[in-house]
Amino acid sequence: MSDTRRRVKVYTLNEDRQWDDRGTGHVSSTYVEELKGMSLLVRAESDGSLLLESKINPNTAYQKQQDTLIVWSEAENYDLALSFQEKAGCDEIWEKICQVQGKDPSVEVTQDLIDESEEERFEEMPETSHLIDLPTCELNKLEEIADLVTSVLSSPIRREKLALALENEGYIKKLLQLFQACENLENTEGLHHLYEIIRGILFLNKATLFEVMFSDECIMDVVGCLEYDPALAQPKRHREFLTKTAKFKEVIPITDSELRQKIHQTYRVQYIQDIILPTPSVFEENFLSTLTSFIFFNKVEIVSMLQEDEKFLSEVFAQLTDEATDDDKRRELVNFFKEFCAFSQTLQPQNRDAFFKTLAKLGILPALEIVMGMDDLQVRSAATDIFSYLVEFSPSMVREFVMQEAQQSDDDILLINVVIEQMICDTDPELGGAVQLMGLLRTLIDPENMLATTNKTEKSEFLNFFYNHCMHVLTAPLLTNTSEDKCEKDFFLKHYRYSWSFICTPSHSHSHSTPSSSISQDNIVGSNKNNTICPDNYQTAQLLALILELLTFCVEHHTYHIKNYIMNKDLLRRVLVLMNSKHTFLALCALRFMRRIIGLKDEFYNRYITKGNLFEPVINALLDNGTRYNLLNSAVIELFEFIRVEDIKSLTAHIVENFYKALESIEYVQTFKGLKTKYEQEKDRQNQKLNSVPSILRSNRFRRDAKALEEDEEMWFNEDEEEEGKAVVAPVEKPKPEDDFPDNYEKFMETKKAKESEDKENLPKRTSPGGFKFTFSHSASAANGTNSKSVVAQIPPATSNGSSSKTTNLPTSVTATKGSLVGLVDYPDDEEEDEEEESSPRKRPRLGS
């Protein structure tokens, strides 16, 4: 037997009854010593590796479908298929299979799997009864035909024999002629029988019968037969829907008649499977496997034919980006691409890779960048869906495009910034589009799917790009909504307007595109008609929660990039302002952000938190929560419990020294007493170490170490104030949206800095950096509805042994009004510290009170 090689694709059927592409190669039939018999071998055309080695078993049932497919099952729930490029190759391999099994190549199935009882009955049949005798195709025989078709469905052998009889006698076309006669005569009984007959023929699961039934000549009559379900009082109107309601739109004329016919056929067959046929029972689920395969291979063929027609795709892209294209036409073009990408999901990874590379080569991403910035909501939605297909399949391709784009475009029109601003400006009250876009951004900035090669690292390059060009756009709503500086708020509002008008100008988009109501200032999430941010607007809170979720992801997965950004922007302080939001879910998002930072157990972050006194808004929120033991209460307790269990010494000392008096009344958990115990144990250990050192060395070393540490920390944390724009951890280029500030803002900042310098000189000196003031609202009175009173807990300053006093500027707290989204903590040096009387805090009510 000659070793004939033919080009094929190898498919396997997965658990979801979908065909998985295992690769393309050349098939041969040859004797394999290890398998002790003739076998089918497929070697990959790319590298010659073995894709398939399958012994031709004498008892295996092979089926030939659609002239170019051979399908068989090797084991339970393991189906294989060979899809041939040429019919001649399929015929030759089919002959080899039939030769090994001793079967007639003219039939399209070698045999079928049967149970023992079926086999016994089959052996008892006379040899002359090879095919089933069909009744004559007449109106008065329809009931008999229906009974025959339904009776064979339980027997694989009889199903096969009936299929052969139907095929050989051209019976289906005769049945469809009877259908037309029954409709003309309004013969309801006959129409009900025809429904059972056609449905039964579909369940025969024969590709050759499908090719007849789904041909242009027959398919609408098949649909007509399936309208007359006896279980329904009135027939359905499926043909009316397919011919009148469902309109086939050629966005670009398709010149290939075979392609057009294939598209029509696939749509109608999919409609039959999804809409007309009832959901198969557990006993029928395998009856339509061939129908699923028929649709699958049709879709593969459609995508391949379109992909190979570069003239067609080039014309689609040209019209999509042409300024002269009207809105309706552009909407159709975008919807076509959306459907095209949806079809591509039937392809396997190798084929999808080629498909998306073709789209990328033709310019899909620049085209998306244009249409995503348009004012048509339907177009933007479809463009977002296409973008999601691209990101899901190849985030690296999208990242590579935006990094190249950054070299020749302004930040405002970068694709990722357009995506971010679409998220920010989502007009949906539930922010459905914003949630989808946030998920795409999360995929793009996820280091887990970034590539690393010997020449370059995608992770470092892309994250540098993202933090330099995009992060300021993402955090703009957060910084705006937590700012007490009117000028800063005005800048961000102006930035929104500028960005959208810039994107929609003719030089960067289409001449007809102008900032519409959907993307104008009036519809920035949470803004009102007076161009002011509504800080506790529910939609604003939802958006800020999404942004915080993304920033929390950055803290977990990025290293020095997000650390630099948090330090330079004092971002955690701004986030903790949201602890005072009336929306608990937003306060929890802010708390989760801080919890992730503390969870890293990074001393840089810990010193930043203690220096900025950033536990204060968290503790204020806990006390303001009163006796309500809800999710917020539990989340705050868990934060402090983590610090206790992990024994984070710097944070433990800070909490106990500064806040223990306010927290000691909380006794329903042992967290705070446990922190105090940890603190005292550590203090005892330090004292023991000091006592073991000679006094003169202890004095010198203590003085030197304390001073050095103090100076280092002051230098490190004030570095950003003294040297504007200098990175704290690593020299990453810092985003500077301030470059676009109006001149009057620059003058304002100069005046503000001058005033700050004066304030620093006029601040009262203290003997030690240890003293500070802690103001909080009494939780019990807040919970009981009474007026909250501010209570000041003065911690006595610690004195060093003979060391000179050092003037430091520590933050002074201000009690926030409940329900307003303002800062719980003033920024350092904003105003002189006011001396307040010392008093002790009231105890927090316990569970039993």
From Swiss-Prot:
Its main location: cytoplasm. One of its GO terms (cellular component) is cytoplasm. Gene3D superfamilies: Pleckstrin-homology domain (PH domain)/Phosphotyrosine-binding domain (PTB). This is Serine/threonine-protein phosphatase 4 regulatory subunit 3B. Residues 733-764 have a biased composition (Basic and acidic residues). It holds the Pfam family PP4R3. Residues 714-849 are annotated as: Disordered. Coiled coil: none annotated. It comes from Homo sapiens.
